Amino acid sequence: MLEGNRDHSHALHNIHWDDLRADCENCFGLCCVALPFAVSADFAMSKDAGVPCSNLQADYRCGIHVNLRECGCKGCTVFECFGAGQKVSQITFEGIDWRESSERAKTMYHVFPIMHQLHEMLWYLHEALVLEAACSIRQELNMTLEETVRLTELRADEILKVDVHAHRANVNRLLLQTSELVWMDVRRNLKGNSKERRKNYRGADLMGAKLKSADLRGADLRGAYLIAADLRHANLRAADLIGADLRDADLCGADLRDSIFLTQVQINATKGDLHTQLPGRLSRPAHWIA
């Protein structure tokens, strides 16, 4: 499946990729306040939920942003809110920040993780909608996206009542269908292999696996543990990577064009180089080898 097979012209919704990326200029530093973290390989210190990070400044900017990795806060450079931060700050709470009211702050801290999950679902649904292979379920995908958008636009007290688990289950059902449709499209284009079975590594333990130059086209890698896996020069075109743990995976020279349900969070946690090929919707991390 080639990048050109992403059919943007038939999308029925008005969501754009930029709506699903962090806009820190319009956020009240929610990821630096609402979320907890503990001392680990990703964080040099611990912080409880609802406690502002010691590096958060009065203007909601990070005081060590340019040196986060050097300061032991690699986890901060990996995180992506999918646009939930600015939605909560500017839409849900109408530009009134958490410093103005302790009661409002508590609600905001609880709303943010829910909004984060909903926006992540929007990312996946938006991607599925522009895939030509998923044209047969496009109407249902669009209806589910519209419902997800509606949930993100509820009042704060209503968002807290959303059954995220049930909604995610419905979204996941459609994403699974999309994944299978993409695989059928891939299989049709494999010369002489029209009956080839899909490589299934769903939830597999592939930590540290030696997969250099592996042919993983269209593979099901949903939820696979690929921590520190050697994926140099691997062919991952059209592979389903939703939920795959790619921390410290080596993607130097790998081809991930057309891979589906891959997010910036996952890519930010990997190693890569100038020859790593990514889907157009994703950015090359600053820490990758030039």
Residue spans of the language-model regions?
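Tandem repeat scaffolds
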Residues: 186-290
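Hydrophobic scaffolds flanking metal-cofactor catalytic centers in soluble metalloenzymes
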Residues: 2-189
